[in-house]
Amino acid sequence: MIANWVNQFGKSKTNKLIDYLNQSHGTDLRINLPIDKVESRLLDQGISWSNSPNSKNFIRINSGLRKILSSQIHLSGKVFVQNRAAGAVVEILNPKPSETILDVCAAPGTKSIYIFQKMNQSGNLFASDINSSQVAKSFKRCNDLELSIDWKVKDATKDIFPMADRILIDAPCTGTGVISRNPDIKWRKDSKDTDKMSAYQIKILLLPEAQVA
């Protein structure tokens, strides 16, 4: 893996990447309320956090994550545990109200929820995943939050999807981009895994592209 990085990025950038991935970066939290309304609730629970440098919709939790997960503010959908990079993907998609959007390979649905909220809950969001149990959990979560996202079990390599204005495909991957959160990936993945996953990703990416209106 390191050899591939050196070939692709050069030694200097690879060393910087390794240094970054060997560090702990805390947990990101997406907020659906003005920060001043969230701040007091976090402080009351003794939770340490800091602002995200490039988004008013995210903060970084430094300590107290377990308190967040069991808090009413989290259970009611006022805040979501969501990686800042995953949120940036939704912002690049730039969903608009009244559009029809596909979210493919969407479970567990955190990005789907962000997309629908960006749409002001107006329009059609079709979310799908091949894992039926994950789809059931995602549907229940959205239903509990009163979000009318249309969840379906679909195989993105062969099933038919509705026409859409925009498509987000979070294709399955080797996970090497999140080594800082899952360091054991360094020892569990090799070049064969990468080649196999790349071929699978291409099959997924080619099928829904014809569904963009």
Specify the residue positions occupied by each region the protein language model found.
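S-adenosylmethionine
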Residues: M1-A213
